Amino acid sequence: MHSIYAVLALALMPLVAAQPARAQNDPTIHMVTYIDVAPAAKDQAAALLKPLAEASRKDAGNLLFQILQRTAPAHQFVILATWKDQQSLDAHDAAAHNKQFRSQVEPHLIAPIDDRLCIPTFVAAQISREVLASLGDSSIYVVTHVDVPGNVRDKILPALEALAEQSRKEAGNLRFDVSYQKTRTNHFTVMENWKDQSANDTHELAAHTRAFRGVLTPITGALYDQRWYKAM
């Protein structure tokens, strides 16, 4: 079985060149925010998150602000935000609507809000807000935290790039982006959006997906943390 994964991984390596890495002078940043509330408070949290999203999308420099609710357990949420630059994010952090949300949701939290500032690494053109708004309830999101020891970071980078490039070519894929965490550069967030669960299921069985897992599993520093979400 290991030999199969090795062959698949080697087959994908020439594909890395097609999608360029982030330009050094590109100031765009991603913020991935995990919010876990008490199970009984999931509806209250959702009610607080919706106005936060509406206000934040109007912030200067905001390019994307998505609120996602985990399919199971449903009391876990994630915010996927893209900002033009650090200054825009700083202004959002200081904004009244952001501070109000954090104050109001605090009594419902079962863990501190987990903000992860990320640097776009392998990204494609962003889908428009109009297209996102038109997606039906069948659309599925996947957010995966990939953690490897620092001394093998360079080994996982080409595997992540190949995975992203091949996955974007799949039927039903709407987004497949990879970012690394600014403070821990060996931690990555993979952000996916699929037309429906069937498209995602097909992706999970694809040769390039299995090849990536074959590269990652022997070197990972943690369990494979993959979560499915629906847009609110």
Region locations from a protein language model:
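N-terminal secretory signal peptides that target proteins for export/translocation
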Residues: 1-2
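Glycine-rich beta-strand-turn "strand-cap" elements at beta-sheet edges
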Residues: 21-28, 66-73, 101-140, 175-186, ...
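Bacterial N-terminal signal peptides
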Residues: 5-17
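N-terminal targeting signals for Sec/Tat export/insertion, comprising classic cleavable signal peptides
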Residues: 27-63, 83
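Short, well-ordered beta-strand segments in beta-rich or mixed alpha/beta enzyme
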Residues: 28-36, 66-93, 138-147, 177-204
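An amphipathic, aromatic/His-enriched active-site/gating alpha helix that lines ligand/cofactor pockets
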Residues: 54-64, 82-117, 166-174, 193-227
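Surface-exposed interaction/gating patches
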Residues: 132-175
